[in-house]
Amino acid sequence: MERFEKFNTSRQEPLRLSIALEEFCREEIPAEHRAVYIGYLRRRLRPALLTLVRQDDTLSLTALTQIVSLPAEALNDAIVLAASEKRTAALVWLLRYKRETFGFADRDFSL
């Protein structure tokens, strides 16, 4: 309960994001708290996605994509971040998600 109060009263976005990412997939929290966390994460999708990539947390990435679909632009940014920071598990997960959701465009090398 105190984490939810800290989430609601804090003005620090990094702290609010951290709490929401830790709490939204826990099963023992009340449904109304989960709804608040999910609403927040939907509004802050790109920072949430990039934070999970930096943490190399594929379980939370899976949980996040079950509540909201990732836009192609945010997904591409996350792929670039995962590759540049050598977050292999997150990179593989993101590439699989991209293949399943958007597919990859075939390049035409004809002359």
Which functions belong to the PLM regions below?
Residues 1-111:
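Ankyrin repeat (ANK) tandem alpha-helical domains that serve as protein-protein interaction scaffolds
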